[in-house]
Each structure stands twice: as structure tokens, then as C-alpha cells.
Amino acid sequence: MTSEIVLIIGAYLLGSIPTGLLLAKAVGVDIRTTGSGNIGATNVYRTLGRRVGIMTLIGDCLKGLIPVLIARHLQLPEIWVAATGLAAFLGHVYTVFLRFKGGKGVATALGVFIGISPLSVLAALAIFVFTLIKWRYVSLASITAAAAIPFLVALIEKKGLLITMSVIIAALVVFKHRENIRRLRSGTENVFKR
């Protein structure tokens, strides 16, 4: 039990590392005061370009993937695997290093689900890409893919604990996009540009 608790705390702290903020500061920019003010990959991409944006995406994704892979490697019961993934995600969304004001969690959730249900991720990515190509809104694509994940996990994994975790993560991703939803409804949301 002690090792499981240590893993969950470690997952939360790893998830809490503000990748986008650190990478932006390395090039002399406080990402919280530019663009949308969000520390996630989309704002970093828009503000600082493709290279730093992709580095942020990969870093945030690894924060979710690594703890889940460790839990899998230790052959922990499903409840601990789910709790570890959720802890990493919550670390990103509510980071202790920034007074619990983190990112929206899309990339970290991606990492968690790559470790838990790769087939669900492939299907969700297809939904994301289709939505992005058709409507050109990253936020809408993220929300749509997040909303689909619980159904995909239920269909593919059929494990109650993983389904519950995916519902919690999806709900928080959508909740963290509430300002984007308002802008989508008012027609003022930023369109994705390559």
C-alpha cells in the first residue's frame, strides 16, 4: 500500500510540472501573460511557434504516460493504475506549483490514455483530426475527443474503474474549456492556423 501511495503522490507531482511555462520561460516569455494565458501546448504553439509547442505537447503527454507505465510495470491492480493516471492528470490541471491553476489537461490526458487504452486513443485521435479539419477549432476538437473517450474506453476496455476514471477526466477537460465553449457559441473563438 505504501508504494502505491508514493506512486500516486509522485504522479501528481510529475503532472504538476508546468512544461509550457518552463519552456516559454527558457526563451524569455511568461506564457501566462501572452495569448490566451493558458500554459498548455495550444497557447504555446500559437505564441512561440511549432517547435516549442510540440515540445510542450510531448512533455505534457509524457507526464500522463510515464506514471501509468510505471503502475503497469509494477503490475498493480486496476484501481491503482486508474488512480495513478488520474493523479497525473489532476497534477497538470491543478498544479501545486502554480497555486492550483494549471492547464486544460488535453495532452496529459492523452498520455494517460495511451498507457491505459491505446486503441481508444487511436479512435479519439481520429475524431479529433476530423473535427479539427472540418471546423478548424482546436478547442472544439479537444472537447469532442474528450467527450468520446469514456464511450471508447467502455467499448474497448470494459473495465468499470477505467470507465469511471475516463468519465472524470473527460468531464474536467470539458469543464476547463468552458471559456472556449462560450467563445464558440459567440463566434469569437480562435480558428486554428498552421
From Swiss-Prot:
GO terms for molecular function: acyl-phosphate glycerol-3-phosphate acyltransferase activity. It is an enzyme of class 2 (transferase). The keyword Cell membrane applies. The lineage of its organism: Bacteria, Pseudomonadati, Thermodesulfobacteriota, Desulfuromonadia, Geobacterales. It holds the Pfam family G3P_acyltransf. Pathway: Lipid metabolism; phospholipid metabolism. InterPro entries: G3P_acylTferase_PlsY (IPR003811). This is Glycerol-3-phosphate acyltransferase. Probably interacts with PlsX. GO terms for biological process: phospholipid biosynthetic process. HAMAP family: PlsY. NCBIfam families: glycerol-3-phosphate 1-O-acyltransferase PlsY (TIGR00023). Its EC number is 2.3.1.275. It comes from the Bacteria. It catalyses: an acyl phosphate + sn-glycerol 3-phosphate = a 1-acyl-sn-glycero-3-phosphate + phosphate. GO terms for cellular component: plasma membrane. Keywords: Cell inner membrane, Cell membrane, Lipid biosynthesis, Lipid metabolism, Membrane, Phospholipid biosynthesis, Phospholipid metabolism, Transferase, Transmembrane, Transmembrane helix. The chain crosses the membrane at residues 4-24, 78-98, 110-130, 137-157, 161-181. Its main location: membrane. Catalyzes the transfer of an acyl group from acyl-phosphate (acyl-PO(4)) to glycerol-3-phosphate (G3P) to form lysophosphatidic acid (LPA). This enzyme utilizes acyl-phosphate as fatty acyl donor, but not acyl-CoA or acyl-ACP. It is found in: Cell inner membrane. PANTHER family: GLYCEROL-3-PHOSPHATE ACYLTRANSFERASE-RELATED, INNER MEMBRANE PROTEIN YGIH.
